[in-house]
Amino acid sequence: MDVNPTLLFLKVPAQNAISTTFPYTGDPPYSHGTGTGYTMDTVNRTHQYSERGRWTTNTETGAPQLNPIDGPLPEDNEPSGYAQTDCVLEAMAFLEESHPGIFENSCIETMEVVQQTRVDKLTQGRQTYDWTLNRNQPAATALANTIEVFRSNGLTANESGRLIDFLKDVMESMDKEEMEITTHFQRKRRVRDNVTKKMVTQRTIGKRKQRLNKRSYLIRALTLNTMTKDAERGKLKRRAIATPGMQIRGFVYFVETLARSICEKLEQSGLPVGGNEKKAKLANVVRKMMTNSQDTEISFTITGDNTKWNENQNPRMFLAMITYMTRNQPEWFRNVLSIAPIMFSNKMARLGKGYMFESKSMKLRTQIPAEMLANIDLKYFNDSTRKKIERIRPLLIDGTASLSPGMMMGMFNMLSTVLGVSILNLGQKRYTKTTYWWDGLQSSDDFALIVNAPNHEGIQAGVDRFYRTCKLLGINMSKKKSYINRTGTFEFTSFFYRYGFVANFSMELPSFGVSGINESADMSIGVTVIKNNMINNDLGPATAQMALQLFIKDYRYTYRCHRGDTQIQTRRSFEIKKLWEQTRSKAGLLVSDGGPNLYNIRNLHIPEVCLKWELMDEDYQGRLCNPLNPFVSHKEIESVNNAVMMPAHGPAKNMEYDAVATTHSWIPKRNRSILNTSQRGILEDEQMYQRCCNLFEKFFPSSSYRRPVGISSMVEAMVSRARIDARIDFESGRIKKEEFTEIMKICSTIEELRRQK
């Protein structure tokens, strides 16, 4: 059937067709090679925006540092980072005046969090810069390595298990004259293979102790590792993102906790809420501006874009904000919160892997590590790279670049939102003291500004004043990329507003289709995505029905499980046909076993096993869901599982789907070609953690697991839990006296061993 595409849009307002312009179909672009060039761009740009600031030298590390705070006010529209301290403090004071008690209350909430947070909070998150190995690691491993090194250097406050105590160790570690670390390394030997008589390379993994003096340790503690941001759609150029080490993470977490608590109380903040809640918040602000501008005023909205938000923010400004927001709080609390911005003012950016060179004529490839960029002859590089290296050289120390100004992506989203909202707050008539006034929305670097005034001149004046106010706080509204419209049509964080929010369906496209976890999860996720889009994204019944049929088709193709009565030949069709013929009630077979699809848009909320349970043959039920069947027993049965969805914007989100453990919920094994590399020692550590955590979960199944209050180690918790459970089981007659005594004996032995340790 041929469709003339223009017919699709005849009755659709232009805004509703916005979906079709988004770059969300197909694979997103990934980066290859090193991020060194992108990182140098970031460092150079950041310094350029602050170039008229004051240069100083860090006394501990010798790093040159540029401080643009209270620098000269810009005379043109170029982006700049010269925030004025007194202006920022005044904006904070006005924010507090409009929201009495906001800082005080948020501080009280945060103090409670600080005292209760366990150090395992830092195991969340994926890649983390591991300063002990000088490269990226999974967060849990990086934390473990840090704690291990701390303990071997006599720093033991962290043993309490509280995050605040771990941070005490971090502070102490910075005063130490030297730190001893264990590094993994790899030895290669050429040996003759006894069987084949060929020479082979044998690799052995070793650990060796290394001492870092105070300067080297501080550089590592203040380092942010950089990588290229992958899978960014709609951009030609890649860009660098940073991942901080464990010394910085805990402090950042507490600052962001305070800022999050403040954002929750600000009606103009687009964080930390999301989805429908965010849309409701937005709609409220728009409604407020529309109702107040009925007869005498006109109202315009700017869909705003800021130039290089992160690179013009400054940690010193954040320090001023924190100092103000916590001014009546206990000294210890103010100190804890001020450390993150201080560390960021002294941060170092690791330049990544370096450059790859290849000589076509000599068939040679070689890598120039970042450490060599400081003194390598520049004749090997092309012009643009040469300029980059020349500009960055004065800032280099041991392969890292001193980067005092700027914030790096994604570190202080909440706190920078507070800064943005403080300007929106100044738009009230009692502050503008004139006929125009403004309000708006801020979510990290994205904003929408609504200006009301009696006439166009007033609107222009209001926008100009907003623009200049932003400059005073180191925020640069881009005149090229922002556009203004009559209120009622604007875009904010990829939500399109036209007298109400228009569904931007293309955002959801990447999550349709078969996820590739396993047959059971994929079926469940597939129908859940369709259900969610019917609820949230204007996916109509006819389209949903079509999406469902396409999904089933895709699913059958992926898992080669076409219906038992089909003519299609696949690797599985022989087995599936056999099962089809043996089955009395064919409707009871799961789609993944060659059964028919019983889903329609009315029953998407029911897991397939439940939908078909009554229709199944008894022996099929017995095979499918029998815990004694070795293909089922590995799965703990939980009612809800989480899948990680990659939405179009924002971080990966967790999507819940109903999970019924069956023979189809298998877990694939990971490829372990890692075993003969220097990662192997790390892997063994990781497996040890995995085992400990699995054991712990056996004692505390998720349903009964409450965060341990008070300070007890994992072992103590498990022993006391074992004793309680054993007593209950013994008293209710589930276990015999001998078993009970044996359990008690084992518990005592474990405690004895701990005492001896």
Swiss-Prot record:
Pfam families from the UniProt entry: Flu_PB1
Residues annotated as domain RdRp catalytic: 286-483
EC number: 2.7.7.48
Compositionally skewed regions (Polar residues) per UniProt: 55-64
Cysteine pairs bridged by disulfides in the record: none
PROSITE patterns: RDRP_SSRNA_NEG_SEG
Chain span(s) of sequence motif Nuclear localization signal: 187-195, 203-216
Enzymatic class: transferase
Subunit structure, as described in the record: Influenza RNA polymerase is composed of three subunits: PB1, PB2 and PA. Interacts (via N-terminus) with PA (via C-terminus). Interacts (via C-terminus) with PB2 (via N-terminus); this interaction is essential for transcription initiation. Interacts (via C-terminus) with human PKP2 (via N-terminus); the interaction competitively inhibits the interaction between the RNA polymerase subunits PB1 and PB2.
Protein name: RNA-directed RNA polymerase catalytic subunit
